[in-house]
Design a protein with these regions (language model features):
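Extended low-complexity acidic/polar segments
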Residues: 189-200, 272-300, 377-422, 431-435
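Periplasmic polypeptide-binding modules associated with outer-membrane biogenesis and secretion
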Residues: 21-111, 121, 135-154, 159, ...
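Bacterial N-terminal signal peptides that target proteins for export
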Residues: 1-9
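C-terminal outer-membrane beta-barrel translocator/porin domains of Gram-negative envelope proteins
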Residues: 106, 230-361, 369, 377, ...
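Gram-negative/organellar outer-membrane beta-barrel architecture
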Residues: 91-243, 316-320, 330-331, 404-436
């Protein structure tokens, strides 16, 4: 008990110290009329990347509240380890310390079917100084070393030619045996996601993707199967930041059509076609609220798929990216899903800048505890037989590039024993693309 009290006291001390440091970095009296704005420390970042995030304007009184929000938004770009402001009279100067933009490093991620994947990656977090992130990767499963392989190229940015059109491009080659769905996944994927900010808190979403599955035995064609995906949606986003959200709500609705191109005609008195063809209705809702160093988050991801869905596209529940009450296996597979989560975070150590041998980065520590709800079914209405629940706890390390490293332990009364997990990136993000 004494250790727990000391731990809480230490965390509160860090929190107070962080607030005190923030106040001192302002060094600008509230209400001072801003006559000009300057930037310092932008070695690789173009000024317009910063300017579009600023709320304090020349000719207006300086607001510390606006700066606090500016700082969160600028940190959300994942380009800077430190952001501070100073003013000499009305001359407002923003100072930045940039994150090391070239990252040659081991590549890793966790998936439900391949477990921990390791490999090599080369990433540039700020291509041309325009907040464009590009990354090439090779990964192999630690469980099936050099047998389950993945080759990937990713590129993304929140803007396109100065327009508020966020985009994310993905090229993925997979050579891997899927022991959850029991088939050899030799596939190619090209995917483009768009996010156009129509209003300050309203975005129009679009997606288009092409997949080619080699040796796709579930399509009645052992050579290959080609599938197109295209979808439209909208999102209301009132979060303070997209990364490490502390406050706000997010709601997204997306309608996507998936259709196999090389469908096969089958006749037996009556002709019909065979092939995957379904619609996906997605709802993604998130809400966060802070009280001191505590952050409460509640999320719900629901995907309903009317139509013909083949086994290689079934959802799987079990693992660090979906449901932490069990390990992934072929038992909990289904066409439709609902993932529910309630999580409490304790910010033990808020984001801290650091530098080693000229490489700038940041780190933070959060303690987490929560509840996972898993609902998965194939047809009709789901019942209690389709539901499982679990509690979990762990430690999150907040770091650049991958958002966070997650060390978690889950327990489900249905299983009766703890499950240990390691993951990267927020679960609300990885649960959207956990298949790969």
């Amino acid at each position: 008990m004494k250790k727990l009290v000391k731990l809480v006291g230490l965390a509160l001390l860090f929190s107070v110290a962080g607030s005190f440091a923030t106040e001192n970095t302002l060094a600008c009296p509230e209400g001072t009329v801003v006559s000009s704005i300057q930037f310092e420390g932008l070695e690789h970042t173009k000024p317009r990347v910063v300017e579009r995030e600023l709320l304090n304007k020349a000719g207006e009184p300086f607001s510390a509240e606006k700066f606090d929000l500016e700082k969160r938004r600028l940190q959300d770009l994942d380009l800077f380890t430190e952001v501070s402001v100073d003013c000499n009279g009305g001359n407002l100067k923003y100072s930045f310390v940039e994150i090391f933009r070239w990252i040659p490093a081991p590549a890793g991620k966790t998936t439900e079917r391949d477990g921990l994947m390791i490999g090599l990656a080369l990433a540039n977090l700020n291509v041309l100084g325009e907040d464009i992130r590009a990354e090439v990767q090779y990964r192999t499963s630690s469980e099936r070393f050099l047998d389950n392989n993945e080759y990937a190229f990713y590129a993304s940015s929140p803007y396109l030619f100065g327009l508020p059109l966020g985009w994310n491009f993905e090229f993925l080659r997979t050579d891997s045996y899927d022991d959850i769905r029991d088939y050899q996944d030799d596939s190619w994927l090209i995917d483009l996601d768009l996010d156009y900010q129509l209003l300050p808190h309203l975005s129009i979403l679009g997606t288009v993707a092409y997949r080619e599955l080699e040796k796709a035995v579930f399509t009645f064609d052992e050579d290959s199967a080609e599938l197109w995906e295209y979808g439209l949606g909208f999102a209301f986003d009132f979060r303070d930041t997209k990364i490490d959200t502390r406050k706000g709500v997010y709601y997204e609705y997306m309608l996507t059509h998936v259709k196999q191109l090389d469908r096969i005609a089958i006749c037996g008195g009556r002709c019909y076609t065979e092939g995957e063809d379904y619609w996906e209705l997605l709802t993604d809702a998130r809400a966060y609220y802070p009280v001191g160093p505590f952050v409460t988050g509640a999320t719900a991801l629901v995907r309903y798929r009317p139509g013909e869905v083949y086994r290689f596209d079934y959802f799987s529940h079990g693992g660090v990216n979906s449901y932490r009450g069990r390990y992934a296996d072929g038992e909990r597979l289904g066409v439709h899903e609902a993932l529910l989560n309630l999580e409490e975070r304790f910010v033990l150590l808020d984001r801290q800048p650091a530098s080693i041998a000229g490489v700038n980065f940041f780190y933070g520590v959060q303690l987490v505890a929560g509840f996972d709800g898993s609902l998965i079914w194939n047809s009709g209405r789901p019942g209690w037989d389709n539901y499982e629940g679990a509690v979990y706890g762990g430690v999150h390390l907040v770091v650049p590039a991958v958002d966070r490293l997650r060390f978690e332990v889950g327990y489900s009364p249905d299983r009766g024993e703890p499950k240990f997990f390691f993951g990267m990136i927020e679960k609300v993000s990885t649960s959207r693309w956990r298949g790969r």
